Amino acid sequence: MEPRDNQAEASYTFGDRSSSDIVVRLRNEEGRDDWIYCHSKILSEKSQYFADRLSDKWPTCKILDSRYCVEVICQESDYDHHINLLRLLYVVSDDVHEDNLCHNVKSALGILSVAKELSCPQIVTACVNYLEAVPWEEGEEEEILRIVPRIGSEAEPILARLQPVDQSAVLEIFVSAFRFATSSPPLLLGDIKSSAQEQIEYMITEDDDAPLLIADEEVKLEVKQCVKSLFVRFFQCLEEITLKPVESEVINKKGSFRMVLSDMCWVFQILTKMEVVRDFVITWADISEKLVKVVEQLETTVVEAVEIRVKVIEVTAKVIEAIGYGTVILPTAKRLQMVKLWLPFVRNTKPLVDSPVREDEENDTVRYKIDGEIWQALESSFVSIILALPSADQAEILTEWLSKNGLYPDLTEAFEVWCYRSKVAKRRLGLVGGEEENGMS
């Protein structure tokens, strides 16, 4: 019985000068020059490049020593990969697994490039199988994207994990993530929920790349359904506080009201990017009267109650801004109501937040601050809403503000504009009326 080929090949040892019948002279431009003792049988069978170089058809085959010394010139960065590839030619076979040939991503990439250059199909396959299966670091991923596309179709499996998926798959994962991001999972899953919210925002944001998901009608419908469910939870919390404002579980440290408010603040940002905030704003405006009444009856010395006020203001600031700058158009009466409800609430809450609120005396930790930009945005939004109201309503609001000694929010701009408009009103409107009469005569 004749020995199998791989058993015969086992008799050859890489670098064994005594049995070698060919030298691979490896050189680079930096002057490095190594003579590597090999065997023509191994090289010819495992590499088409060496098979061609050692064949009778090679142009220099009849030159003395040309068939006994093959010169390979390479870059310094690929030098060690060439040596490793020559070594692997002695061990690669169908019986040797990829994890015994490759030991890390960097080495596998380097050997893959050389194997492609020297036409070593078994080595190429082994490297591809290895790279397709192992995890990559971020830096390695960029290197893979640089090298693998040059290899050709045989290396395509490596890039399978980076390929874009069809929109139906994107939609499915977006909807699943959005449902989870607006749900109330156990506290232990809080980090996962936060991650879901971050990735949803990333998916629909246009940066250096186009958004992963286009907010078409199907997407908007799914999002609206999730927001409706979130409002149902919000109403349930509100009812519980209404019935038991002090003992209610929803305002203690393990309660859900603050979490719902945090979710609503996040949801509003997403709805803004998707240009579907109208339903949210209208619903918030409709429940504002009850919400203000319920929250104001909470004891302000309770830390959790102050945090609830903060969360309510964070959501309200976004709603007021949408109304103030015309993103959502509401009737005059509703806009006036929003100012009369939220202006005093915001004014009364600011001192509570600006004064340090401590969780306990032992750690003396300051909690529940509102970003200064939110106060400023609220102020600007209130001014915009007020200046769009009828003059008489403006006067009523400004009179009340001045009676409070000009406390926050600063409505000076609205006051100045009101004074100017009121003083010149007769002349301006008379001029308009005169122009109309002249035009009709």
From Swiss-Prot:
Pathway membership of this protein? Answer: Protein modification; protein ubiquitination
Q: Which GO terms describe its biological process?
A: protein ubiquitination
Chain segments annotated as coiled-coil in the UniProt record = none
**Would the keyword Transport turn up in this protein's UniProt record?**
no
Q: Cite the BTB domain residue spans from the record.
A: 20-98
Q: Does the keyword Magnesium apply?
A: no
Report keywords, A-Z.
Answer: Ubl conjugation pathway
One family name in Pfam for this protein: BTB
InterPro entries cross-referenced by the UniProt entry:
BTB/POZ_dom, BTB/POZ_dom_prot, SKP1/BTB/POZ_sf
Source organism superkingdom: Eukaryota
The UniProt comment on domains reads: The BTB/POZ domain mediates the interaction with some component of ubiquitin ligase complexes.
Q: What does this protein do?
A: May act as a substrate-specific adapter of an E3 ubiquitin-protein ligase complex (CUL3-RBX1-BTB) which mediates the ubiquitination and subsequent proteasomal degradation of target proteins.
Provide the protein name.
Answer: BTB/POZ domain-containing protein At3g05675
Natural source organism: Arabidopsis thaliana
Q: Write the lineage as a comma-separated list.
A: Eukaryota, Viridiplantae, Streptophyta, Embryophyta, Tracheophyta
